[in-house]
From Swiss-Prot:
Protein name, UniProt field: Argininosuccinate lyase
Alphabetical list of HAMAP family matching this protein: Arg_succ_lyase
Main location: cytoplasm
Taxonomic lineage: Bacteria, Pseudomonadati, Pseudomonadota, Gammaproteobacteria, Enterobacterales
NCBIfam families reported for this sequence: argH, PRK12308.1
Any one biological process term the GO annotation gives: arginine biosynthetic process via ornithine
Source species of the chain: Sodalis glossinidius (strain morsitans)
Claim: Amino-acid biosynthesis is one of the keywords in the record: yes
UniProt keyword Acetylation, yes or no: no
Length: 457
């Protein structure tokens, strides 16, 4: 049964009905719709629309419906109901008869769906926070296990300065911490209930909306009924945060894909997260990571799509807003899946420490140390930078590491260079000198790991 048939003399064309119906995706709001309906039935008691006996009948029937859905969710999609609100109402009428027709008194699908979606978003944020927490833990545990694995750090995909694999892991842990912070921040704005806003002008019944909000676990009710049903900021926020989070995971995936190449050879991925080739027997492809990288695009697309949907809408509900759900559901599902997959990839990763160290000693990654050495002896940094550049050119010409150039040759570039330069150019020294907060010095890495573990405990 449609919820709006009285105005029409002709039935909807089946092609339009298929185009218009949303049950195939908004069925995911079933639990939220039922929970919201229970709260609304209680509110109707306070204004005399329902007796307490009637309300209890409705609540019992709604709870039975919820249990039925949990047992056999496929029953929803077998229905020809227009949307989840229609489906729940019809289930109620089937169970309690005409009493079920009283539930929608004073309520619009406009405030109903806005409430359902906020309730769903809150639950999804909680699940995402859990997945982010688990991935952060995996990164910190991996960092702790590989504090001594030295590898090259890159800028412009060229070797730049030595770092450790632990430092790399902790960098992504920091990104995830920002993702977590953003999600926690949006919970504040999700904590306001639109239920009772009606179609756009508010409800004609003297319902205490703040009390109603409290029954649903919200901190308060919205202040303006027109904004309440027009607002999809929370959808845009979550899509934005998902887009940012997926960019982080895409960069994580790209780094590991590169580290896994034969050209880099820093890591070995587990067989559990790789696949082979149908033609080339030797192949072991990083499919899990490539899919994480690829799925980033679909999440960015969902954000762009929703922004374009909302940008020209007049206030109050428009059917365009039905398009808010599929992209949101898919984007947050994708983000959640990728968070879990990233943790699985880390779980089986193997570091090739000798190769990492070898690469860190190549590419003149200790050149900055020589510049700092000169600065410590009174040479202005810009001049020191130029001197070291000349020394690097000479080392390249000879095909040798910077630290193997004879002292006499180094002194030709600057007479202040002495024998004590060679320990400075050693790999261990390159790390040890970076002891300011956030640097790669061993004591800083150990402290960062300890602090991260404390935050995640």
């Amino acid at each position: 049964m449609a919820l709006w048939g009285g105005r029409f003399s002709q039935a909807a064309d089946q092609r339009f009905k298929s185009f218009n119906d949303s049950l195939r995706f908004d069925y995911r709001l079933t639990e939220q719709d039922i929970v919201g309906s229970v709260a609304w039935s209680r509110a109707l008691v306070t204004v005399g629309v329902l007796s307490e006996t009637e309300q209890q009948q409705l609540e019992d029937a709604l709870n039975v419906t919820l249990e039925e859905v949990r047992t056999a969710p496929e029953a929803i999609l077998a229905s020809d109901a227009e949307d989840i609100h229609s489906w729940v109402e019809q289930c109620l009428i089937d169970k309690v008869g005409d009493l079920g027709k009283k539930l929608h008194t004073g309520r619009s699908r406009n405030d109903q769906v806005a409430t359902d979606l906020k309730l769903w978003c809150r639950a999804q944020v909680t699940e995402l926070l859990g997945a982010i927490h688990l991935l952060q833990q995996a990164l910190v545990m991996t960092a702790e296990a590989h504090q001594d694995v030295v590898m090259p750090g890159y800028t412009h995909l060229q070797r730049a300065q030595p770092i450790t694999f632990a430092h790399w892991c902790l960098a992504y842990s920091e990104m995830l911490a920002r993702d977590e912070s953003r999600l926690r921040d949006t919970l504040t704005r999700l904590d306001v209930s639109p239920l009772g806003a009606g179609a756009l002008a508010g409800t004609a019944y003297a319902i205490d909306r703040d009390k109603l909000a409290g029954w649903l676990g919200f901190a308060s009710a919205t202040r303006n009924s027109l904004d309440s049903v027009s607002d999809r900021d929370h959808v845009l926020e979550l899509l934005s945060y998902a887009a940012i989070g997926m960019v982080h995971l895409s960069r994580f995936a790209e780094d590991l894909i590169f580290f896994n190449t034969g050209e880099a050879g820093f890591i070995e991925l587990s067989d559990r997260v790789t696949s082979g080739s149908s033609l080339m027997p030797q192949k072991k492809n990083p499919d899990a990571l490539e899919l994480i990288r690829g799925k980033c695009g679909r999440v960015q697309g969902a954000l762009t799509g929703m922004m374009m949907t909302l940008k020209g809408l007049p206030l109050a509900y428009n059917k365009d807003m039905q398009e808010d759900k599929e992209g949101l559901f898919d984007a947050l599902d994708t983000w959640l899946d990728c968070l879990h997959m990233a943790a699985l990839v880390l779980d089986g990763i193997q570091l090739k420490s000798p190769r990492c160290r070898e690469a860190a000693q190549q590419g003149y990654a200790n050149a900055t140390e020589l510049a700092d050495y000169l600065v410590a002896r009174g040479i202005p940094f810009r001049e020191a930078h130029h001197i070291v550049g000349e020394a690097v050119v000479e080392a390249i010409r000879q095909g040798v590491p910077l630290e193997t150039l004879p002292l006499a040759r180094l002194q030709a570039f600057s007479p202040v260079i002495d024998e004590d330069v060679y320990p400075v150019l050693a790999l261990a020294s390159c790390l040890a000198q970076r002891k300011a907060k956030g640097g790669v010095a061993p004591e800083q890495i150990a402290q960062a790991i300890a602090e991260a573990k404390q935050r995640l405990a």
